[in-house]
From Swiss-Prot:
Disulfide bonds: none annotated. Tetramer. GO terms for molecular function: carbohydrate binding. It comes from the Eukaryota. Gene3D superfamilies: 2.60.120.200. Lectin that binds beta-galactoside and a wide array of complex carbohydrates. Pfam families: Gal-bind_lectin (PF00337). Residues 1-138 form the Galectin domain. The lineage of its organism: Eukaryota, Metazoa, Porifera, Demospongiae, Verongimorpha. Keywords: Lectin. The keyword Lipid biosynthesis does not apply. Coiled coil: none annotated. This is Galectin a.
Length: 144
């Protein structure tokens, strides 16, 4: 699922979805040239860590894909979710993305590429049981 849009500093993306019982759920903010400006990927007992081969468990992986290559991942460990409902918000501030899950600030992520080229927001469940409930842009960013 996706929405096409124009997006700039100070605006927010909100995705509401049921969390996966296993697997992955991701929200991508994508530029018109295909650059993934922000990739937020929640993994609940999914895949395997390169260092151990054991599954990722309750981790949020944040990254960007520039020029066809993924950058260095930033990770937030021990991310608690509920099966029934999750609310992800990625807000653009002046210099960083502010990432919330269930109304809790869990990470900031520095811009790696200009954000005014964003034209699309994508939601993916990687074939797992997460279900998108709502995907929208909020103008302007909600005050905290």
């Amino acid at each position: 699922d996706h929405i096409d849009l124009e997006f700039d500093v100070g605006q927010c993306i909100q995705a509401s979805y049921t969390a996966p019982t296993a697997g992955r759920t991701s929200v991508n903010i994508v530029a018109s040239d295909g650059t993934v400006v922000l990739h937020v990927d929640y993994r609940k007992h999914s895949g395997g860590k390169p260092s151990t081969g054991k599954p990722w468990n309750q981790i949020l992986i944040i990254n960007s894909k520039l020029g066809g290559s993924w950058g260095t991942e930033e990770k937030v460990h021990d991310v608690e979710t509920t099966i029934v409902y999750n609310d992800y918000t990625g807000c653009k501030q002046d210099a960083d993305f502010s990432i919330e899950l269930n109304q809790k600030d869990i990470a900031t992520y520095a811009y790696r590429t200009p954000v005014n080229t964003v034209s699309r927001v994508e939601f993916g469940n990687s074939g797992n049981d997460a279900v998108l409930r709502k995907l929208c842009v909020v103008y302007p960013a909600p005050s905290k």
